[in-house]
C-alpha cells in the first residue's frame, strides 16, 4: 500500500507555544520571528494572565509576522478572540466550551483540544 503525505498537517511539525514569563528580556515579536525563521510553522498564543483586550492586541500585533512565514496562529481557549484576530485556530482546554459547539459557532477555525 502506497503512503501519501498529508500536507494539510505539515505545519504541526514544529509548533511553538508562548510563555511571556520566560522571554521577558526580548519582545515577543522578535522572539517569534526568530522561531519562524528557524522553521516554526504554528504558534499558539497561550497567555492566561492577559485580559481579553490585551490578548487581542498581542494577536493582532503578531499576526502579520506569522503570515509573513506562511505559518498558523492559534489562540488558547478563546475562539471569539481567534475569530476577531483572524487566527487560524483555537486550542481548547478542559474548561473550555465543548469542541463541537466551538466548531458550530466558528466553522472557519481549526479546533484543537487538550
Please report, for each region that a protein language model flagged, where it lies by residue.
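Conserved N-terminal beta1-alpha1 strand-loop-helix module at the mouth
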Residues: 1-97, 101-113
